[in-house]
Amino acid sequence: MSICVPAIKDLATVPNDIWQILQHDLDNWDHQNVQYSYDQAFIRHKAKLYFTGDPLNPSIPDDISNVIDWCKTVIGNEYTAIRCFLNLIESGHEFPIHVDTLKLHCLSRRLHIPLSNAEECFYYTYDKIDEQYIPHEHKMKLGTLYELDNINPHSVINRGKNSRVNFIVDMIPTNQITANLLMPDIEQRNLFNKLRK
């Protein structure tokens, strides 16, 4: 029997000035203009990427830099943001059980701030017991900073009438930043493939 207990941790309440920055950006996001979208029968989500690509030299918009600086006050100034985006999951859609597979996911701390009132959106983490995944249901509240353990199996289901939008940032210890962070991690890729079977 093997057991892992991935978690969603409530880290802090988002201060009003940071909340206003994120809400302003969300209000001005044209959902038709996205850098990434994934659309299948049961999975529909869109993302607005603030920066990605070269983890050694990211270009960060000033207002988002303020949000990241606040996140550092919560988790520690030894961290650097290497990916940052808004992520939307439409009403009635889901992310099935999966793990994130890049090297950066194995080294980083993934932070979430829920920005939309999607009351029927649920997050699931899983214990693995005797080769079966046992789900644990979680809710994320508006105005709260969370950390999600995304290298262990997790999923999201939006059963509500509203789209779910979260601000997501990957923070990595500055001394561990290397050029190959955006390459797949072999162990994580193998686990991802097993979950898909």
Describe each model-derived feature in a short phrase:
Residues 70-146:
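Catalytic core of non-heme Fe(II) oxygenases with the double-stranded beta-helix
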Residues 2, 83, 164:
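A residue-level signal for beta-strand positions that form part of recognition/binding surfaces
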Residues 122-197:
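Catalytic core of Fe(II)/2-oxoglutarate
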Residues 6, 108-110, 166:
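Intrinsic-disorder/low-complexity, polar/charged segments enriched in Ser/Thr/Lys/Arg/Asp/Glu/Gln
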Residues 40, 44-46, 52, 89, ...:
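Structured loops at beta-to-helix junctions and adjacent beta-edge loops in soluble globular domains
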Residues 9-13, 115, 169-171:
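Short beta-strand-to-loop capping motifs
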